Amino acid sequence: MLGFEAAGTVDAAGPGVTGTSPGDSVTALLLSLGGYAEYAVASTWTGKPESVSWLDAAALPSSAEAAVRVLRQLNVISGETLLLFGGGGSVGIIATQLAVARGITVISAVSEHDEALARELGATPVRYGPGVAGRVGALGAVDAVFDAAGKGVLADAIALAGAPKRVITLSDPAAADFGVTLSEAEPDRAPGALDETMALLADGKLQLRAHQTMPMQQAAEAHRQLETGAVHERIILTLP
């Protein structure tokens, strides 16, 4: 069953589970899927404060976990420059804000549609597409590259970062051919990621990608819309 993430109310807690109890509001990362349902089994979750909407809570887990995980793996520190491909996506938006808050300079390769947003979040936008390496190089040296787009940018990424070890991709299947790490979600690979980002969201210090809603019964239509590539917002499926 599809569904990497979901938000809802705890129905029951398994043996030995601590930190939550029936009736609690939570959002969960579902690495074994199952979010497209009324009930799901979760092992990675965080509480939902009252100040956070259900829609924002549902939109947080997978993107937040990925952003935190890759930034930790890259070990980018204050004063360094991070090049981010896919800065206008749900992962990129969170990664930009986390990096900027840590004193990291972010160059965000985005479409024309997302340039203003990247700038608003504290990044320097560059137009994605042919010639992007030259446009980035004109801004100065790059210390690390976070590829959240997975669209054939690894050769440019390595040239800009200076070595494959400072490049990580979330989804480019050619990663091994370039000696680049393909980062995948696994239990406990980014401990505390949901707690950290939920706290920022509750404090108004984290912005998420814009989203729209559709009823669960229209899940197939939601996927058809996403496959067109023309949807600039996340689609959140809701249950009555």
PLM-predicted stretches and their roles:
Residues 5, 26-86:
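NAD(P)H dinucleotide-binding glycine-rich loop of Rossmann-like/cofactor-binding domains
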